[in-house]
From Swiss-Prot:
Keyword tRNA processing assigned: yes
Subcellular location: Cytoplasm
Name used for this protein in its record: tRNA-cytidine(32) 2-sulfurtransferase
Subunit: Homodimer.
Motif window: PP-loop motif: 46-51
GO biological process: tRNA thio-modification
UniProt GO molecular function: 4 iron, 4 sulfur cluster binding; ATP binding; magnesium ion binding; sulfurtransferase activity; tRNA binding
Entry-linked Gene3D superfamilies: HUPs (3.40.50.620)
Domain of life: Bacteria
Amino acid sequence: MITDTFSRKSEYSTNKLRKRLRRLVGTAIADFNMIESGDRIMVCLSGGKDSYALLDILRNLQAHAPLDFELIAVNLDQKQPGFPEHVLPGYLSEINMPFRIVEQDTYSVVKRVIPEGKTTCSLCSRLRRGVLYRVATELGATKIALGHHRDDILETFFLNMFYGGKLKAMPPKLVSDDGCHVVIRPLAYCKEKDLAAYAQLVQFPIIPCNLCGSQPNLQRQVIKEMMQQWNKKYPGRLETMFTALQNIQLSHLADTSRYDFVGIKPHGIATEEGDKAFDEELLPDSPVGMNHDDAASELDEACSTEAVQGGTI
């Protein structure tokens, strides 16, 4: 009886989470015009939770959306020691997904250049990016899809602000630095914890990301922990911060290259949007980015935890 109840609850949670993730991906794709009819999309698959979820959701979209587009999964085997070469080909063959495994020994290059015990992620990423751009050209891909999510975007924003002195995040859609490809991030509106929960429920064959032995990026880890503490103490803060990235007012920053502060003159016309220079701005009591789904998600999580701790499941 307990097993049946748990099974039903698990199935309900999986379906609810799947629908939410699909809706968020669909919204991001529509907002940024990420996918167009006739696209050939190269989905970069690392074997981690995010790229698995990305491929899974895009396959569902391909089956049900009115747009006609192709998907091809690409994995870069960087020859890291212990990398399970059979996992991704087995999974992709099982789901009848066209794929290509690219073998390129970037691991040896990184180990030769970066001192032992240092973070190798930056160089590894640059080498991987170059290979993937080349493969995208060979495949005739019109878009390159990456599995970065909302938390990645916010982390990058704070990394650039705190350590780089720039207001710069990770765009949901951009032209690649070689100028030849359009890169999209369909998971831009998805929370990392939702993707982690989905991967666990669906049981993707996850490949560990630390096979290279690299030390963690300490700066990114500091930012990640800061965001986790904020979210725990002030629920909804991350949603509000992400909303802020979509609501930029250049006239209220201080970048003279982006806004003509030099040419400002009074125009004699009162506007509701005008700045009340001497007034403290009234802010809403509830976080701006918090919506019904976010609140429901928090409640579901709290109820599930309470049920488990209370022994009702």
